[in-house]
A protein has these predicted regions:
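Position-specific recognition of the canonical hydrophobic site in helix A of tetratricopeptide repeat
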Residues: 10-11, 45, 79
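Terminal, low-structured helical/coil segments at or just beyond the last alpha-helical repeat
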Residues: 80-118
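Helix-start (N-cap) detector for alpha-helical repeat units in TPR-like alpha-solenoids
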Residues: 34-35, 68-69, 101-102
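Canonical tetratricopeptide repeat
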Residues: 4, 39, 73, 107-110
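Residue-level recognition of tetratricopeptide repeat
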Residues: 7-8, 42, 76
Length: 118
């Protein structure tokens, strides 16, 4: 429950610091939950801490390697860390997946121009 509330706050840039605290609490209770781990990594990304974001998102993608949202978050982070070839590889894997969870046109644009155009 903490994860969903905190993630929704992050997406609206509302109480970001509190959201990070909530996610850390949730993560400490369930360190093997890919969605909590992803949300915590995404919180660090939204806060501009791309190195810390990469640690959590890398772990999240290991826990749930074919999840398109986790993959997209990880690729966005890799791009910010100037690891553009790796980022494009992960975005391409979303394009090639059978998932319809994300807009593949948006992902194709990221492959060309990066996440900042969106």
């Amino acid at each position: 429950m903490l994860n969903y509330l905190a993630y929704s706050w992050l997406e609206r840039n509302y109480k970001v610091e509190t959201a990070i605290e909530m996610l850390m609490t949730a993560y400490n209770k369930k360190t093997n939950d890919p969605y909590i781990t992803d949300s915590l990594g995404w919180a660090y990304y939204k806060n501009g801490d791309f190195i810390e974001a990469e640690k959590y998102l890398n772990y999240a993608i290991q826990l749930k390697p074919n999840d398109p949202v986790i993959t997209d978050h990880y690729a966005d982070t890799l791009w910010k860390l100037d690891r553009k070839i790796q980022a494009r590889y992960y975005w391409q894997s979303i394009i090639e997946s059978k998932s319809n969870e994300l807009d593949k046109k948006v992902i194709k644009n990221k492959i060309i121009m990066g996440p900042n155009i969106i």
